[in-house]
Amino acid sequence: MVKSRRSKMLARNGMFYPIIVFAAFLAFIYLTFGDLWVSSPEETLKLSFVERNGTQFYADGQVFYVNGWNSYWFMEHAVDVGRRPRVRTMLQAAAKMGLTVCRTWAFNDGAYNALQISPGKFDERVFRALDLVIAEARRHGIRLILCLVNNLKAYGGKTQYVKWAWQEGIGLSSSNDSFFYDPNIRRYFKNYVKTVLTRKNTVTGLEYRDDPTIFAWELINEPRCMTDPTGDTLQVSFDLYPHCN
């Protein structure tokens, strides 16, 4: 009798455990990816590219004013399950306040949760987080200024590019300023810019360069070349990048 009852309990448990495992799996999927779902296309605001006419910006034939702010951390938070909802909360609040443009990072080079792990090698998980940021901004009618590298060491920056070239034995100098004049480092960065421009957003289906959500591109955050205070090195370096695509 006891043996029979025990057998029934084991049988029930044998069915119960897979159900628990499956439920836990569903919970994991929801917590990990639940916030990735962006509203359906009909709920997403339609945006057109902002154009310039003289000294004035226009969108859809109307004067467009930049009321903006800086939230550099969007991609960094979007890749983290626990902090991801903060991106949506910030965009919702900004839209209610009438803000129109947000500046944020589109880079993280060689650091924790790096977008670019090494030259030309990317973490798709982090790229999808950036996809989400752009899609969420579009949903709330917010345009973005995407910055492509840091002059400072945080998030890798130009220091990381110089380090990569130096480690491969092709760097001209260990100076951080060689980012601006070393042809191998410039090649690294141009390839990075091209990859970002031609990235097809996994949420919207648009390549970044074709997405009117992106108001502008910023080549580098707080650029400075300490070895050339005239600014000539910076100017020559930047003149090369419009041809990336």
Where are these regions (language model features)?
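Generic signature of intrinsically disordered, low-complexity, basic-rich segments
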Residues: S7, I19-A23, M90, V133
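Membrane-interface recognition of transmembrane alpha-helix starts
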Residues: A11-I19
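Short, low-complexity, Lys/Arg-enriched N-terminal segments of secretory-pathway carbohydrate enzymes
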Residues: M1-R12
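Hydrophobic membrane-insertion alpha-helices, especially the h-region
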Residues: P18-T32
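Active-site mouth of glycoside hydrolases
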Residues: E42-N245
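Low-complexity, Pro/Ser/Thr-rich intrinsically disordered segments
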Residues: G34-E43
